[in-house]
Structure formats: structure tokens, C-alpha cells
């Protein structure tokens, strides 16, 4: 037996969940990985802590092993070994999941750490090949430097493009350019049996539909093909500190919502709420003069002082980088770690009464928790939003008809114990926002998952009307549910007819 195989066995020996009559031995799994020359980290190896410390330290899970491929053949080999040994598989790109789903969301997964696969290559026709381990900041820098091109994506430069694009990809130019997944033209995917397939609108089109909104449930996306657009010459970022109190905030929020219904597509913005008060900030694709003109109908109604920062595309990306001096993030790279809880909602427009309840919650409940929480209310839709253009069924992303995105985050530093009341505080906020809507009127963004949802609740809220089709595609491409987490898409039941059964009945198998 090779030295690598012996090291793997030693690392796997402490994984008690493997020791049962239904699971092959540690030795079989270790030997398979060793024979395939898959780079692996196991418990006790120097890289283990870096690979397995989650962004959210409140939710810590222990993988059985972490594969660290540098090429797609190694991904396929690792998946094949896991399949043979009945071990669930999870992809981890940037590792920023709020619920540690990149580690499986539970113990015992083989994690495919993709961050060593981060190549970005721009073709002369403006299309780009981007490996799933690339961080958003690196993607932005490479596309700009290679050809002054850009891709619509979120604003945290350390987030990996793999999961970001697989479930949406909202950012501060999304109303102008749509979600990241809207620019996807193809993908290279490793399936449950180790097969490598190419999918697009014309090849494996059902799989291509599914990975644009629910990608992590269907395979390991090793590489994306994206269309890109010319990087805007000017993007103007802005902020307005709002002098609102509990009495004036509801009217201000309603005025902002009314303005957003018809605001130009070049404008993307959010209301940010913390213990220090309300702030409106965002970005405008264009120069400062055009931004000021666009905001004229709003400023007289909400008050506050406007501050602006005009720059080029990369300056826009740096502006939203939370003070990080380097946005061109490549491995080895570590993440900030927090102990946190997130929840949220995608909703239609809110009523005046709902905004009153929102403001009362801030003033009477959230403010008591000090300064560790934040709430963002993003404008998702509106008459001029590119996000709203496609139909709900055009991709697996099911929220094209929603107007607002809410995100609640409550955190402490990893050295502190997460407070018992934090979970309840977040759920109360979500209930205030959603309790006036029927279940089919609101949903949740899969890139802002809620750890407190059951599997059934999560699937319905993340994928809504598209869930049934996703379940059917799951049964076709991952019938054994190898790619899973506690909130992933589950395969539709397969059945076979039998002559003794009544019409419409079936035998499950």
C-alpha cells in the first residue's frame, strides 16, 4: 500500500460515520483516491484547517476528506471514488456559504475544493472561459485587463464564481445587466458517475437549465462559458445617510419603493439598516451628472446628503470590496470568519403597513441587540430591471417576478459565543416582512440560505414553481443523490408500472 494511501486511512480512521454495514471500508476509499492520484487533505494534514474552517463558524462540519484538484480529470476521479463508496460529494469554490453548505451542511462529505482551478480566459469574440474556483475579484480584474470586458456579479471580491453563478449572482449592476447566470452560455459538468459532459442550450439543455439556479444539486461545474459586455467607462457609486426616525422611516421607505418602480436600469441600490440608522447606497452605470439627474425625483422626498464616487469599472469593484486593498484574489487565500445567522426574503412590493411594522421592529427589537446586525433591502425588479425580463421558467432561478430582496445578518466574532436570541431575532424580521403574503407570493434567494429551514421548506422557497421540473432532472442526472446537502433538490420518485396495479399507480424503485 502506498504512503499516500496509508495517510488517507489514518486521516479517515476518526470518521465514525463511515463505520456501518452499508458503507465500504476506509481502505477502499483511500486506495481509490490514491490510485487515481487525486490531491487530498485529511484530518491531521497541514492544509486541513484552512480547507475546513467555515466562513460561518457557528456551523462547523467535518468532511471525510477534501479533494484539491487542479484539473477536471481529478474532479471526475474523486467523484467516481465517492460514488463507489457511497460518500456524498459537495463542491466548494470560494467557501462563503452562510450555512457552510460548501462543507456539505453536515458531517461526512467528500468536499471538492475548487479554488486551485481559477483560470479566466477571454476570447476575441468577447466570450470567456472561467473555472469555477475563480474569485469574483479575480474574474473582474482578468476580464478588464484582457480586453476591457466585464461580467455582472456580486460585490464581494473573495466570493467564488462557482456557487455564485450556480444560484443567481445578484450585484450592484444587476438591474442593468441581469444576474451572473443570465450571461452563462455553457458549462462543463462532472456527473455522479464521473462522466464529464458539456451542456448548453443545444446540448443537455435540461441540465443547462437546472444549473442556472440550482447548480450545486446536479454535479460539479468545473468551468463556465460566459458572454461578457464592454466594461462601462464610468460607474458612479453613491451613499446617502438618511436622517430618519421611527416616525419618518415608513414614509421614507415607501417613497423609495415608489421611486424604484420606474427608476432607470442603470441604477441599482439598497437601503442598509444598522443600529446607527438608515443609509441608501448603490451604483449608477454612467457619470456623476447622470446619477444626480436620475435621483432628483427621490432626494426631495427622503432627505439626506448625497456623496458620490465616479470611476472606471475596476474602481467600482474596489469601492464595494469592503476596504480590501487587493481585489485580485487567488489561492492560497483565506476568508474572514464570523459566527452568524442569515435569513431573508424575495417579495413583491410592500404596503405602508408592512413598512410601519418594519420600522417598528428596527426601533423596538433589533436596536436592543447592539451593532452586530444588519438588514439590506435591495431593489431586484421594477419596470426597467434586466432581472425581470426573462420568464420564471427560462432558467431554474425562480424569482423573476419579485421586486425586493431582503437580507438579515446577525453576527459575532468567532471568539464569541453566538447569542441564543439571534436566531429568533432573524426569524421575527422575516415574518414581519412576509406574513402578509401567501406562500406562493414570496421566496428566498438560494445564495442567502437559512440554516433553520427544513429541507422541504428550503426547496419550496428557493426554487418555487421550478422545483417540480428540477426534481425530474435530478432523477435523470443524479438518481443516487450523490450531490446533496440538507437543503438541496431531491430526485422525483421513479416508478415502474405493473399489470396488477390500477391505472395511475406505480411501484417505487
UniProtKB/Swiss-Prot annotation:
Disulfide bridge partners, by residue number: none
Name of a matching Pfam family: BBE
GO BP of this protein: terpenoid biosynthetic process
Superkingdom: Eukaryota
GO molecular function, one term: oxidoreductase activity
Applied relevance: Diterpenoid pyrones display various biological activities and subglutinol A shows insecticidal and anti-HIV activities.
Keyword DNA damage assigned: no
Its EC number(s): 1.1.1.-
Signal sequence coordinates: 1-21
InterPro entries, alphabetized: BBE, FAD-bd_PCMH, FAD-bd_PCMH-like_sf, FAD-bd_PCMH_sub2, FAD-linked_Oxidoreductase, Oxid_FAD_bind_N
Enzyme class per UniProt: oxidoreductase
Function: FAD-linked oxidoreductase; part of the gene cluster that mediates the biosynthesis of the diterpenoid pyrones subglutinols A and B. The first step of the pathway is the synthesis of the alpha-pyrone moiety by the polyketide synthase dpmaA via condensation of one acetyl-CoA starter unit with 3 malonyl-CoA units and 2 methylations. The alpha-pyrone is then combined with geranylgeranyl pyrophosphate (GGPP) formed by the GGPP synthase dpmaD through the action of the prenyltransferase dpmaC to yield a linear alpha-pyrone diterpenoid.
Protein name stated in the entry: FAD-linked oxidoreductase dpmaF
